[in-house]
Amino acid sequence: PAERLAGFPCWIELYTPDIDASAAFYRDLLGWEITRAEPGEPLTAEVHHDGRLIASFEPADAAPGDPGWQVSFMVDDVRTAAAAAERTGGNVVVEPTGVTATMAYALAADPDGNVVGLLEDEDCEGPYPYQAGMPVWFDVLASDLEPAERFYREAAGWPTRRLTIADQEQDFYTSVVGGRSVSGVGRAGYFGVEEVPSRWRIYFGVEDADAAARRVRELGGTVIVEPFDFTFGRMVEVADPHGARFLLTTF
């Protein structure tokens, strides 16, 4: 049987007030190839890395909420997913919309108001490779964990699993797709910071978190949380010159 791929983070977008300046920043920091799309295309600027289309940059005034990074999850049927979002305590921000003959999307807010994309796309390449320059992890925090887990399981198609570290159950659920944990939702305060609504956090792979943090500063960005060690590597939380927050992590 074909591998069930619903529930994996399949697309990211950066909503920015200056696409060209943002392109220069991320091109230098992560080695991306960023090109303006042709007029009439659904994307404004295309981001490629290691031969794969991984993201787009869009104008800030097109953002469904605050500008910054947004993630979308693969679903089997976008209308069913949108209905599930309403049923599980969230709400639909953008109704299911066809983009091409094989692609449709909707935007929904989870019970805490964090906006997430729901994408039905027959041509999606599958989960992002686990390597430098790629988005390698995604998570969000919830004021009430169990309703949030239900929302992401039913609306975003996550095959959820309670995270266990050293035989201790954590206040955190992961989405396990193809045998690999690809994203998660945790209780507010899980990372030591009470921040709800938070917003979806995207982690990009780097070879050296400390060197990457220095480069962020040199390029006009901000280091929000200095590099630190955690269970799976070393990471740093940063913002680009326009304030879009993300994380850089070794792997």
Regions found by a protein language model. Name each.
Residues 1-5, 8-17, 45-46, 60-84, 88-136, 140, 161-178, ...:
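Vicinal oxygen chelate
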Residues 4-6, 10-52, 87, 95-103, ...:
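Core segments of cupin and vicinal oxygen chelate
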Residues 13, 22, 37, 60, ...:
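Ligand-binding pocket scaffold of soluble enzyme catalytic domains
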Residues 23, 54, 82, 93, ...:
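Internal amphipathic alpha-helical segments of the cytochrome P450 catalytic fold
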Residues 38-129:
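Active-site-adjacent scaffolding segments
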Residues 53, 63, 181-182, 191:
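Active-site/binding-pocket entry motifs
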